[in-house]
Amino acid sequence: MARYVDIHPVNPQPRLVDQVVAVLRDDGLIAYPTDSGYALGIQLGNRAGLDRMRAIRHLDDKHHFTLVCRDFAQLGSFVHIDNAIFRTVKAATPGPYTFILPATSEVPRRLMAPKKRSVGVRIPDHTLVQALLEALGEPLISTTLLLPGDVEPMTQGWLIKDELDQVLDAVIEGEAGSLPTTVVDFTSGLPEISRYGAGDPTRFE
């Protein structure tokens, strides 16, 4: 049964944030609100959590998960990013974008796209998520909470608790966007839109 945690969206209570961090550090799987709908999240070393996320979303082993980072200092440990791309990405973050970039050796091999050795990263514009990432001290491995047959991510914590109570360890109630991220692939050196979503794509076209 999932723990239901109602955290203030503007002033997240540290005690409640720490409760969620404890779940993550115990290899738990959480559902949490972001600026692009709800997402599933686990800590970096949680191998079993990857399989649990795949099972919930009916994903195959080729699905690429995202590293949700607190800031550029953290993001820079996991991807290679040159000055020109850095300026472009920085102008769009924090925000509802996922950027595909070449992975560093800090990225677990199971998270890399095998042919390109790349990984998706993002910095969300969401106070609650920022508080969670600060307390955790590392990125979350994450995927949009988009259930099989749905076209948009789930946006209500209590509905997620009701529907996925037996397969999650915690659900955070909070404000969430209604569209998934816009995905921008920089692995060729130039931006290519892989998915249109909440973020304005015109700055990359």
What are these model-predicted stretches?
Residues 1-205:
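Active-site-adjacent structural elements in enzyme catalytic cores
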